[in-house]
């Protein structure tokens, strides 16, 4: 079995897959290294024979996590690294090492699955959008704040915006003009997110052609599903790219 980890800005997503068929047998989300170790300790009975990860954290933070993983399981950890090219996709950044690794793996995975031009939108803490031509040329992309970041910035920098998570969840039941602060903020942020997604789709159709494949991934992908009815939602898209970057026999 193979342990896979996606170490993002806010959360660590992990799963254990059957090395043969790639079927997920366990998985979870952790908000800290300690929480991750606690979750994985409960699965020490699984015969994990290999581990691979992608991290957008600092080298020091990543190294510390790797050391903890190697103490927990008898494995050497493979770590995804930046590249100019992978699986037929050419990195479109002028400085290829500056493209976030999770973003790179997601767009590589999108092209690998589509085998044609594609738009990949990852809706997490930040929202990223990347366009890949049919020949594997990464045209570049965009980054904007995600729902949680927009919400937290308004709460932090606007004194009179105060509400709890329960109010936030209730507010998301409609897009009718808000009649309370939570409704106004939550619905306003969601409309901004949906507007960004619509604009990305229009640009993809212009640059890549109307038949391009659309992929949505990330924790907030379901919030914009209605905007792109033909999009494919693939929660583990980064893990698909990770397998291409760090193949294990």
Curated annotation (Swiss-Prot):
Residues binding substrate, per UniProt: 93, 100-103, 181
Binding, K(+): 122
Residue positions of the active site: 102 (proton acceptor)
Pathway info: Cofactor biosynthesis; coenzyme A biosynthesis; CoA from (R)-pantothenate: step 1/5
Subcellular location field: Cytoplasm
Alphabetized InterPro entries for the sequence: ATPase_NBD (IPR043129), Type_III_PanK (IPR004619)
Enzyme class: transferase
EC number(s) recorded for this UniProt protein: 2.7.1.33
Organism superkingdom: Bacteria
Keywords, in A-Z order: ATP-binding, Coenzyme A biosynthesis, Cytoplasm, Kinase, Metal-binding, Nucleotide-binding, Potassium, Transferase
Classification via HAMAP family: Pantothen_kinase_3
Family: Belongs to the type III pantothenate kinase family.
Designated name of the protein: Type III pantothenate kinase
Taxonomy of the source species: Bacteria, Pseudomonadati, Pseudomonadota, Gammaproteobacteria, Pseudomonadales
